[in-house]
């Protein structure tokens, strides 16, 4: 009798524990992507890493040694920080302060790379697997570009994304995912230890060689339309070269 009762309790609570495990994994992970672009200029591959740790998310671009991070202060405030990994330096922004010409308000875009709003505009075409391993394929036609997203909802993670048009194809591939909490905390701790400067104070300090060089090269420029595009390419003075 006791064995039967225990079995029933285990059966009732197992799905809840399973769901909690999925959620815990989604909140602390590192996902690594390759981004392959093919167009008239040829083929190019870049790398992108997505790091999450309980309300903080970072995009690391190995090719430029830049890490962009965002902290969810509350439901409506997001605090951005840009880390220059090669120099162990950081530029901090206040919540609500404009970065790339606008204030950060869309947490799902930063946390997932593909926002809830974008996914909501796409059509589900197939679904495979179950539980944490469920994969959903979404598609959308957008001004001559066909978008295909393979989505893992339990982890809020893209496993594949393709944007194809007559002029260009871009393909994102998830190469690996890790859930090593110690590794993740070390990644963020290393960057928290960088020498940090508030963005509002950059123009007041003319003695810092790093800041002077970055401003001169256009890596840090107030009112620029952006410093790095979504692939992590440096933008000189707000314009792509």
Model-identified regions with their sequence ranges:
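N-terminal leader/targeting segments and the immediate start of mature chains
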Residues: 16-55, 193-229, 238-241
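Gly/Pro-enriched, hydrophobic low-complexity segments
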Residues: 58-65, 79-83, 129-195
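Surface-exposed, polar helix/loop patches in the mature regions of secreted/periplasmic/lumenal proteins
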Residues: 87-149
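An acidic-aromatic
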Residues: 44-114, 170
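Short, surface-exposed secondary-structure junctions/capping segments
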Residues: 106-115, 183-204
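Sec-dependent N-terminal signal peptides
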Residues: 4-13
């Amino acid at each position: 009798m006791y064995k039967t009762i225990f079995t029933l309790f285990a059966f009732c609570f197992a799905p809840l524990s399973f769901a909690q495990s999925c959620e815990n994994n989604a909140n602390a992970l590192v996902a690594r992507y390759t981004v392959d672009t093919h167009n008239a200029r040829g083929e190019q591959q870049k790398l992108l890493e997505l790091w999450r740790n309980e309300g903080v998310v970072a995009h690391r671009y190995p090719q430029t040694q830049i890490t962009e991070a965002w902290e969810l202060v509350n439901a409506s405030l997001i605090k951005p920080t840009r880390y220059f990994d090669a120099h162990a330096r950081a530029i901090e922004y206040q919540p609500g302060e404009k970065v790339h010409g606008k204030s950060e308000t869309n947490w799902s875009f930063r946390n997932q790379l593909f926002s809830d709003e974008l996914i909501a505009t796409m059509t589900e075409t197939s679904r495979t697997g179950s539980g944490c391993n469920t994969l959903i394929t979404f598609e959308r036609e957008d001004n001559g570009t066909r978008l295909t997203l393979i989505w893992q909802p339990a982890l809020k993670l893209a496993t594949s994304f393709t944007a194809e048009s007559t002029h260009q194809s871009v393909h994102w591939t998830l190469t690996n995912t890790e859930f090593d909490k110690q590794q993740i905390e070390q990644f963020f701790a290393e960057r928290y230890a960088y020498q940090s400067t508030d963005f509002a104070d950059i123009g007041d300090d003319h003695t810092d060689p790093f800041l002077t060089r970055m401003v001169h090269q256009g890596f840090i420029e107030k009112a620029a339309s952006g410093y790095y595009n979504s692939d992590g390419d440096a933008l000189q003075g707000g314009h792509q070269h």
